Amino acid sequence: MKKLAFSAFGAALASVLACNEQPPLHVPGPTVAHPAGKSIELPQSQASVALLARKNDTARVVAFRVLFDVGSSEDPAGKEGLTALTTSMTAESGTRDLTFAQLSRALYPMAASIGTSTERDQTVFTADVAAADLPRFYALLKDVILTPRLDDESFRRLSQRAKSSLEDELKGANDEALGKEALDAAIYEDHPYGHPPVGTAAGLASITLDDVKAQRSRVFCKDRVTVGIAGAFPDGFDKKVAQDFAALPACPSARPGLPEPKKHTGLKVVIVDKPSADSTAISIGFPTTMTRTSDDWPGAFFFTSYVGLHRQSAGVLYNRLREARGLNYGDYSYSEHFEQDGWSRFTLPNIARREQNVSIWIRPVKPANGAFALRGAMHYWREYVEHGVPDAEIQRFGTFLSRYQSLEQQTESRRLGFALDDKTYKLQTPFIERVRAAWSQLDSKKLAEIVKRDLATKDMTIAIIAKDAAALKKLLVSGTKTPPAYDAPKPKEVTDEDRILEAEPLGLKDEDVKIVPIADLFAK
């Protein structure tokens, strides 16, 4: 998530604009009762937009999440990256009355921030402010989203930043993220999900300021927005916000549907040949018809968490590949598309997809251990898919996982984000309550049935970032054993198991493994 923290403008405190001096919020009309800790929804009408509010008078902050049902899947062909760039231009070009520099100076004294996130199907603007500063902050936030400046100078600046994010950051310096995006590109070949939200080189080069303005009018519109607010806001404020955001234009057309991902049989491997890579990054996955709306999803979430809960030592993959063998920093698996929220270990809310995938993430390993790490991950995944999780383990891990969910919702903003996700998926029971209830009834038989229905496919896609793709392809296709290269001796129980892992069958043929030069990846 991009976040605009305006600490760089400390020297400008003396020149804070008069626009900071806002009168108290005028809240017209009847108020809405807000039971503590509960979500209140105001439906869309001619005079307002859809709104979800969570009032908490004991909070010291007010959190905003302005969620649009639009993402990179609606980038026009040849303009890949347009939605994300339009989002940045909305948040970071200033307002009709303020330049970006003036806006930054106005926000600094409030220690306020505005963040954005664009994924395949959703874009969210996030903001947090001290409750005491709500009137003047909201006046700015409203103008940022409703009347952005969209000027030439900001377009040049943000367009160049997007190009740098693609070439220098994603492709140049972040092989972990690159591997995940390469996996999406392989799973969703010739599909609207097939390019990263930041775009492609050709797409970014072709985008004009007029394209940004047209995309904003086309998809950042009234019928696609839900405004979320949480915290210590005054009575009636939610109604005012819903009415203010009705100034967004009407949506000119319905949202287009999505095609099904292409199908293949067995394992399909894409190796991105990156000569400068000093390690090997691996991502594995497959598309699924499951989303959070599915009855099986809580069980699938339990299983993937047991095998590889994100950044937790409780997972099988973490224990066997990192703890026992020291191959990397961690190994995880997910029942839906996952992104980490900043530097935390928690999931980023408001990245819901209409089509989902199950994935395994093997953090970068030494090149000498790339094939072994891949085989190890496949072995443990297959083992638990085939043999299941014992009842005693379900009870033990279920207790931990149920309590862990509370940590996911520690702030007003994150609780609001989860509530918006519940609304997106049309869930009547809040996320935590739903999964805890499902897990309390889970046993080995029920879990095995869910795994068999939803996770037992042999048709998986593997994306690898490697420095010598040709050599790695030859090794994988040959079927030759790939023993690990350790820096220190390992216990006999580990080395005995290594004999199994290093020979884990992949069944790959030459045509199953494709090499993509790094220069060609996301070029167009």
Over which residues does each language-model region extend?
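C-terminal motif of bacterial Sec signal peptides marking the signal peptidase cleavage site
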Residues: V16-A18
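Acidic/histidine-enriched segments that form metal/cofactor-coordinating
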Residues: N20-V27, L103-Q215, E260-K262, R375-H379, ...
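Histidine-acidic residue clusters that define the catalytic metal-binding segment
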Residues: P23-P43, L166, D184-V225, P252, ...
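An aromatic/glycine/proline-enriched structural segment found at the starts
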Residues: P23-V32, E189, T226-M290, A466-A519
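Extracytoplasmic
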Residues: P35-G37, Q46-S48, T58-R65, A77-L82, ...
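M16/MPP (pitrilysin/insulinase) zinc-metallopeptidase core fold and M16-derived inactive scaffolds
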Residues: F64-D128, G194-V198, R311-Q340, A352
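Non-catalytic, conformational "gating/processing" segments within enzyme and secreted inhibitor domains
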Residues: F155, S159, S164, D168, ...
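Short acidic/His-enriched helical or mixed secondary-structure segments at domain edges of catalytic enzymes
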Residues: R161-A182, E260-S279, A324-N328, Y332-W343, ...
